[in-house]
């Protein structure tokens, strides 16, 4: 419990200590590397459960109605749980976990690829350490706030503003490629801030602060765990920032069968 509280304190007030790793201790033989990777994956899995379970219990996530497997009743019934509820919970839990896991994987690929390309890498484990702690804390926080925006009527203006920004980002790429695609929700429309409440402003400020923490943690991870220069660390952060662009381009290519070149 004390260690958990210390990590929370470090994540807020000492991010350099939170994402920093003992590089000398991490650089060892293959067996030590495997052990370090295993520990980091356990940390990520634990944080993933802490992130996804409350969201799932709160009703986040969509899962089409489906009959629970008969074998599930043998496990859930003795625990006093309905097989149908348990099956619905498990499917929504997987969905809620999938987004942050995919984001972490893309972040790791971009982060480690960048430090490798700039020849500042001290190994895979320091990169994994950086990404595990930055995504399971800060990026998970960003996702949580976005989920909250989508379900709370009291911060509807903030939700509309975030959705509008997301659609503008996607349509900028769609228009740049000349793709003939239309999002189900249509093109972005202007959002009036006249009706924004203090709750809307607080939600947007919280989102901005957590996102800033995430970006800064990647910068610190590159500087501390890989000994990168300020310029190299900045380039690494910019590389990670390009992953949403790559994701949208990939989605366009999958939708059309190829990527149009304007």
Which residues make up each language-model segment?
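Juxtamembrane boundary at the C-terminal end of a transmembrane helix
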Residues: 246-262
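Hydrophobic alpha-helical transmembrane segments
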Residues: 87-103, 173-211
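Alpha-helical transmembrane segments and their helix-start/interface "positive-inside/aromatic belt" motifs
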Residues: 26-48, 125-140, 229-238
């Amino acid at each position: 419990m004390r260690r958990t509280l210390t990590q929370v304190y470090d994540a807020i007030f000492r991010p350099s200590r939170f994402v920093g790793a003992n590089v000398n201790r991490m650089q060892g033989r293959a067996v030590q590397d495997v052990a370090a990777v295993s520990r980091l994956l356990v940390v990520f899995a634990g944080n993933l459960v802490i992130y996804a379970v409350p969201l799932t219990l709160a009703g986040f996530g969509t899962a089409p109605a489906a009959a629970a497997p008969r074998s599930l009743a043998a496990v859930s019934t003795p625990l006093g749980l309905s097989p149908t509820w348990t099956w619905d919970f498990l499917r929504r839990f997987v969905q809620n976990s999938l987004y942050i896991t995919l984001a972490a994987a893309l972040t790791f690929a971009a982060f480690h690829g960048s430090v490798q390309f700039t020849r500042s890498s001290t190994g895979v484990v320091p990169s994994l350490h950086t990404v595990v702690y930055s995504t399971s804390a800060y990026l998970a926080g960003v996702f949580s706030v976005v989920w909250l925006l989508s379900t709370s009527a009291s911060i509807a203006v903030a939700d509309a503003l975030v959705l509008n920004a997301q659609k503008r980002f996607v349509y900028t790429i769609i228009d740049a490629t000349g793709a003939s695609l239309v999002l189900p929700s249509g093109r972005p429309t202007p959002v009036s801030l006249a009706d924004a409440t203090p709750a809307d402003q607080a939600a947007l400020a919280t989102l901005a602060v957590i996102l800033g923490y995430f970006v800064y943690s990647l910068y610190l991870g590159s500087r501390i765990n890989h000994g990168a220069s300020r310029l190299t660390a900045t380039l690494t952060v910019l590389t990670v920032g390009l992953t949403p662009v790559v994701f949208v381009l990939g989605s366009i290519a999958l939708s059309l069968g190829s990527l149009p070149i304007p």
